[in-house]
Amino acid sequence: MVKKNDLFVDVSSHNGYDITGILEQMGTTNTIIKISESTTYLNPCLSAQVEQSNPIGFYHFARFGGDVAEAEREAQFFLDNVPMQVKYLVLDYEDDPSGDAQANTNACLRFMQMIADAGYKPIYYSYKPFTHDNVDYQQILAQFPNSLWIAGYGLNDGTANFEYFPSMDGIRWWQYSSNPFDKNIVLLDDEEDDKPKTAGTWKQDSKGWWFRRNNGSFPYNKWEKIGGVWYYFDSKGYCLTSEWLKDNEKWYYLKDNGAMATGWVLVGSEWYYMDDSGAMVTGWVKYKNNWYYMTNERGNMVSNEFIKSGKGWYFMNTNGELADNPSFTKEPDGLITVA
C-alpha cells in the first residue's frame, strides 16, 4: 500500500539487472516494473528487478494505436506474464496512436477494462500533451476515476517542483523527473475511494438528467465534477447537454452526454477548440505543430479562405491548417488557389 507523498521508481530493461543503486538514491524500494511491449517483447530483467524491490505494480508499453482487437491481444499478453500479485497494472500509452482520438480512447478503455476484469486496478500512463492530442481522457476518468499517471518534468532537475505540475483531472501519480532515472510521487492514498468525491446517483425523468447526492441534495445553477468529469446543472438541477454555456464571459460546450468538452469539438458542421479548462479559444491555435485560426466573433475554425491577422493575410487550407504559403502584407487581388 502506498500513501500520499510516497515515492517510487519505474524501471525497465533500460535500467539493467541491478537497480539497487537507483533505489538507494531515491530512498525507496517501491517500483513499477515494465513487463511487456506489444505481443512479443518481455523485459529480460524482470525477475531480478522484482527480487530487488517492492513492486507496487507493473506496466505494459502499448503499440495497439486505435485497434481494439490488438488492444485485447496486448492486454492478454500482459496479464499472462504478471509474475506476482499487485494492486496496479498500468497501460503505458505514449507512442503509435492512430489519427482517430475516439478509436484510440476506445482501445485504451478496452485494455483497461480487461485489467479491471482480471481483478487489478488499471492505470493510464502518458504525457499531458500526447494525451490531449490523441485520447479523450475524460472518458477514461468516467470509467476509471483517479486512474491517471502523468509525466511532466518542468526543469527536469530531479526534484518535484509543483510549479511545473501537469494539471489535469484524476491524476493519482506524477512522474516529475527522468533525471537521472524516472522519479514518481503518489498524490492519492491507496485507501482513498476511487469513486467520485460527490457520491450519489444519476436520475432521469421526462425533462432530463439530474444528480441526486447521497445526502438527498442535488446540484443546481453550478458546475459539479462527478467521476472526474465536469457537468453543468441549470436552475432546476437538470444537466445541460448538447448546449453552449456562457459563464464568466467565457463559452463552454456540454456534449451530448453532458460532459464538458475539451480539445477539438464538432458542433453541427463547425469545429471549435476548447482549452484545458473547457473555455472556447479564439484566434490562433497550435495543434500537433500545425496552426489553425478560430474566429474572434464565434470561435469556429476558419477553412478554405484568407484571414487577416495583424498586418498579414494568411490562407487556411480546407482542413483548417495554415498553408505554408502564401502570407501577404495586403489583401490579394483575384482568386488564388493554394494546393
UniProtKB/Swiss-Prot annotation:
It is an enzyme of class 3 (hydrolase). Coiled coil: none annotated. One of its GO terms (molecular function) is lysozyme activity. Cell wall-binding repeats lie at residues 200-219, 220-239, 241-260, 261-280, 281-300, 303-322. Its EC number is 3.2.1.17. Residues 5-206 form the Ch-type lysozyme domain. The active site is at D10, D92, E94. GO terms for biological process: cell wall macromolecule catabolic process; defense response to bacterium; peptidoglycan catabolic process; viral release from host cell by cytolysis. Transmembrane segments: none annotated. It catalyses: Hydrolysis of (1->4)-beta-linkages between N-acetylmuramic acid and N-acetyl-D-glucosamine residues in a peptidoglycan and between N-acetyl-D-glucosamine residues in chitodextrins. Keywords: Antimicrobial, Bacteriolytic enzyme, Glycosidase, Hydrolase, Repeat. Changing E94 to A/Q: Almost complete loss of activity. It comes from the Viruses. Responsible for the separation of the host daughter cells at the end of cell division and participates in the liberation of progeny bacteriophage into the medium. Strictly depends on the presence of choline-containing cell walls for activity. Belongs to the glycosyl hydrolase 25 family. This is Lysozyme. It comes from Streptococcus phage Cp-1 (Bacteriophage Cp-1). The gene is CPL1.
